[in-house]
Amino acid sequence: MTSSERMAKVVLVDIEGTTTSISFVHDILFPYAKQNVEKFLRNSWEEDDIQHIVQDLQQVPQFADYKALLSAPPAEVDFELIAGFVRYLIDQDLKVTPMKTLQGLIWAQGYTNGELKGHVYEDVPTAFKAWRAAGLQIAVYSSGSVAAQKLIFGHSLVGNLQPYLSAYFDTHVGHKQEQQSYETIAKLLKEDPKHILFLTDIPGEAAAARSAGLQAIILQRPGNAALADDQKASFELIPDFKPLQNLKLPLNKYQA
């Protein structure tokens, strides 16, 4: 099935490498969080929601590994220790849920004060408009927290894109290369998996989605990782959203 022949009721989009450049995430968002995490924790250390995140971070298996790397770990957990651990997680590109939540709070300040604007490719808002006009829903599934997802689309370079989006999912529903995560999303959307089209740049995610019954297409945006020949043969590949701008709803309940 080619992109021009596809039909769906929901388009489920990844962010990094799909709607948004990988360089924005790695060269702007991650460094911003690293640079500001210590100041943020210092100023908000006593707040209940921050302390909940701190407690969750201490339960992460890598926390013990990080402390073992320190020449003189502090006797008590303080904001400097947690800030260092968060920087360690970012450097290791470990997608830990409480760290992602904390990043989202830090980025929120950056978006609010105008230091950050969410990058989206130029074909994204055009596709969003076309899909919604055709009656499709658009949902987001990213390893970044739901709060961070809303910030990128709510404070994008082209304005607020949130009105086009009907649902957001992060690692609270499961990891992105696990079949069950996509089964959970389909249930939460109350939609037949075959009527959900997942767009991503990661073959492992596309495979997990397809094993759950979803349709899946891989984006080959500039800067995305190169694909092996078997991966290219296994999935439909598109360079951007333009081939999908005429995506239509299924004609009836029997058509995928």
Swiss-Prot record:
CDD domains, alphabetized: HAD_EP
Top-level taxon of the source organism: Eukaryota
One Pfam match: Hydrolase
Main location: cytoplasm
Location of this chain's protein in the cell: Cytoplasm; Nucleus
Signal sequence interval, chain numbering: none
Reactions listed under catalytic activity: 5-methylsulfanyl-2,3-dioxopentyl phosphate + H2O = 1,2-dihydroxy-5-(methylsulfanyl)pent-1-en-3-one + phosphate
Enzyme class: hydrolase
GO molecular function: acireductone synthase activity; magnesium ion binding
InterPro entries xrefs: Enolase-ppase_E1, ENOPH1_eukaryotes, HAD-like_sf, HAD-SF_hydro_IA, HAD_sf
Gene Ontology biological process terms in this record: L-methionine salvage from methylthioadenosine
Residues annotated for Mg(2+) binding in this entry: D14, E16, D201
Enzyme Commission number(s): 3.1.3.77
Keywords (A to Z) from UniProt: Amino-acid biosynthesis, Cytoplasm, Hydrolase, Magnesium, Metal-binding, Methionine biosynthesis, Nucleus
The keyword DNA-binding appears for this protein: no
UniProt GO cellular component terms: cytoplasm; nucleus
Pathway: Amino-acid biosynthesis; L-methionine biosynthesis via salvage pathway; L-methionine from S-methyl-5-thio-alpha-D-ribose 1-phosphate: step 3/6; Amino-acid biosynthesis; L-methionine biosynthesis via salvage pathway; L-methionine from S-methyl-5-thio-alpha-D-ribose 1-phosphate: step 4/6
HAMAP family: Salvage_MtnC, Salvage_MtnC_euk
PANTHER family registered for this protein in UniProt: ENOLASE-PHOSPHATASE E1
Subunit structure: Monomer.
Function text: Bifunctional enzyme that catalyzes the enolization of 2,3-diketo-5-methylthiopentyl-1-phosphate (DK-MTP-1-P) into the intermediate 2-hydroxy-3-keto-5-methylthiopentenyl-1-phosphate (HK-MTPenyl-1-P), which is then dephosphorylated to form the acireductone 1,2-dihydroxy-3-keto-5-methylthiopentene (DHK-MTPene).
Family: Belongs to the HAD-like hydrolase superfamily. MasA/MtnC family.
Name of the protein: Enolase-phosphatase E1
Organism, scientific name: Drosophila erecta (Fruit fly)
Lineage start: Eukaryota, Metazoa, Ecdysozoa, Arthropoda, Hexapoda
